[in-house]
Amino acid sequence: MQPTDPNRFTDQAWDAIVESQTVARQLRQQQLEVEHVLLALLDQESGVAAEILAKAGVAVANLRQPLEDFARRQPRNASGTQLYLGRGLDRLLDLAERARELWQDEFIGVEHLLMGFVEDDRIGRRLAQGLKLDAKTLETTIQALRSPAADEAEAEESEPSYPFLSKYGRDLTALAEQEKLDPVIGRDLEIRRVIQVLSRRSKNNPVLIGEPGVGKTAIAEGLAQRIVAGEVPDSLKQRRLISLDMGSLIAGAKYRGEFEERLRAVLHEVTHSDGQMVLFIDELHTVVGAGAGQQGSAMDAGNLLKPMLARGELRCIGATTTDEYRRTIEKDPALERRFQQVYVSQPSVEDTIAILRGLKERYEGHHGVKITDGALMAAAKLSHRYISDRFLPDKAIDLIDEASAQLKMEITSKPSELEDLERRLLQLEMEQLSLSGENGQASVHSDRLQQIQTELQTLQEQQARLNQQWQQEKQLLEELGRLQEEEETLRQQVNQAEREHDLNKGAELKFGQLEALQQQRQAIEEQIQALHANGQTLLREQVEEADIAEIVARWTNIPVQRLLESERQKLLQLESFLHQRVIGQDEAVVAVAAAIRRARAGMKDPSRPIGSFLFLGPTGVGKTELARALANCLFDAEDALIRFDMSEYMEKNSISRLIGAPPGYIGYEEGGQLSEAIRRHPYAVVLFDEVEKAHPDVFNLLLQVLDDGRITDSQGRTIDFCNAVIVMTSNIGSQFILEMGEEEASLDAVELKVLGALRQHFRPEFLNRIDDTILFQPLSRGQLQQIVDIQLQRLKRLLAEQAIALNVTPAAAANLADRGYDPVYGARPLKRAIQRLIENPVASLILEQQFDAGDALIVDVDAEGQLQFQVSKPVTATVVEPDDSPAIAVEAIPS
């Protein structure tokens, strides 16, 4: 094909010429002609040519078929691959060029090609006459379709008939008329301020600035609803509020200047609408810099907006977050001064409850459930208290939405009672099949088979009854959901009729169909309430406070649900649970347990951690073990303990590891070890082990954690410690505690000495913020005996995994306690003694294969005070004489 300059054409016109080559090749024709180009134009996705022809009264199908027939009759050449420009197409391009010059356009567009087609002597004029289309009619249609935004085809992408606002915008007022927008509750001051700015003569462009989720977009939707209701000044009545979709505006803009031309066309349509259009740009910061990479930094979208904004030709509402406004808009003072700031603050809990009450019917209709007022209040209060990284009302609305979705899923799924029953039935049927299939054993199992048959019959009757009840309840709830949806639709129709002043239709709907639906719904609700009164319901239809608390607990890992009876008993007996692992240290155990009970009963200070403790005492007395036991008791897992060995934070710069490196340093994006751990697991036990070894600057960081329950990490995020237990351990003053020995009378004097040593090392403002400073006393021999039992239980569990039982006599346990007792080092020498005196010999016996599965290892003390081991074989059904007992003697292990 001969070269043709693509710079003479708009993008769509050139795309049609390029695509015409594909059409010609499919027809195996070497000569590119008019029919190929027109077929390509009719096939374009944008449909500009088809739209122009349709407006001119030509059915596209009536034109396509004759074109295809004519093209198939042209000569074919299967061997040729080179395409040539036909004489007819060359003539068409000349005619299109004349039309361009006549209309004073810069590029040849689709409309110019169509004008050339109807004047084409070869095929176009003949087909056009058959369809009653002439050049004059087509020209009139094209001029009528020319968008105000594109009087000339001055850019490569622009097509005069393109409906830019409908393609790149969303009419909020039309959605408000159709009742498709959620009701906007409150925000009267902000909406009034927006209306006030829009009513100005110049710079009439408000920008809504607020945190994500506070309701900036909802304010624009509220304005659209007020425009539809006529509750606005005359300057805004009958106006259209169009939300600009920046995503679709930018998407696919691959050619030079394409994005800018799209935006310019949209802005021209708005400015030439005689003030009928108000533009809403959500995420306004995306406009600044958009498109700058295509034609240089001077040609971004923000610079296209500035002149129109300053002159008042364009009324535009922007919305962006506080951070993005600071990062983008404020850096361009010329753009910033053209917008008037309207700050949108987070609503209070009371305002959020009012917003949720306004949205309640929409969510009930969507999910087909009922939402109690208590659930709405719980959503506002619990989200405000426990979800600190998001903002009201968005997080409260999300709680209601997810809790409703969860309940709807439960309604459509089988109840847990029915599933448990079916599993039990399956288990019994498998057992029955197994016992019946054993040859010759049927008589042996006859009693059990009879029991299974009786139980199966009972369970099957129960299953049939529950199935019937479930289907009945499910049908009632589904019918209730359907009626709620219909009621919501009717309400929308009533509102629309009232807006249109169609009082007859409104009264007919409101007092006829709507009342009938409400009576049906009330009857079904009474049936459901009757089932509830009998206490026989399998399904729930109401979202309650407990559902909201469950969602909050799932999101945050903070237990905010109502206490179950099992957990209530566990909390009341928390000291005994902790004492199963921590021997002695009653004061510390009682203080920690009391703090946990206060928190779960809702009596703690909401702005401080659950508890902050400083454990003091010599090594090995249970300071770290108590923190581990607490984590295990609360979370049933020791790995729930967030532990920091403060000996790793002895340098000044190591504090950045806790809250994150400052900007400009490596690791800034990764966050801090402490801040990230608490952000992901806010309900945790945080242990700062051997806190006195840390650099003094670390304690400055801990001040706000202990007092306000919060810190700010390197990225400016607030980390909430209000649901954490802070435990710090230290060996400061342990020498004074060791001097005390077992004399109770010297406790006060020792405590004074220890506190004096604390004051010398820690500053008063740090010590004053700790809830309780607890002294751990040295372990006595009696307490060490109890620790022996705990340590041996661990060893018994390890051996039980190898089918070996371990029996330690009381004398052997006392012997271990004596050998492991050291008041200076606490319980750690005992652990080493057990390792040396029991674990090492047992490991050797296992490797020597002295044990079989089911054997028992007995540990006792001989006459010389040394431990001895004996392997006991399991007793079999065969009676063996005592003299033949195969006992294995093991030499005593010296100390």
UniProtKB/Swiss-Prot annotation:
InterPro entries listed in its UniProt record: AAA+_ATPase, ATPase_AAA_core, Chaperonin_ClpB, Clp_ATPase_C, Clp_N_dom_sf, Clp_R_dom, ClpA/B, ClpA/B_CS1
Region listing for Repeat 2, in residue ranges: 85-148
Region of interest called NBD2, as start-end residue ranges on this chain: 567-778
Region annotation Linker: where it falls in the sequence: 347-557
Binding-site residues, ATP 2: 617-624
Nucleotide-binding in keyword set: yes
GO molecular-function terms, A-Z: ATP binding; ATP hydrolysis activity
Subcellular location, record wording: Cytoplasm
CC per GO annotation: cytoplasm
Subunit composition and interactions: Homohexamer. The oligomerization is ATP-dependent.
Function noted in UniProt: Part of a stress-induced multi-chaperone system, it is involved in the recovery of the cell from heat-induced damage, in cooperation with DnaK, DnaJ and GrpE. Acts before DnaK, in the processing of protein aggregates. Protein binding stimulates the ATPase activity; ATP hydrolysis unfolds the denatured protein aggregates, which probably helps expose new hydrophobic binding sites on the surface of ClpB-bound aggregates, contributing to the solubilization and refolding of denatured protein aggregates by DnaK.
Homology family: Belongs to the ClpA/ClpB family.
Protein name (database record): Chaperone protein ClpB 2
Organism: Synechococcus elongatus (strain ATCC 33912 / PCC 7942 / FACHB-805) (Anacystis nidulans R2)
Taxonomic lineage from the root: Bacteria, Bacillati, Cyanobacteriota, Cyanophyceae, Synechococcales
Name of encoding gene: clpB2
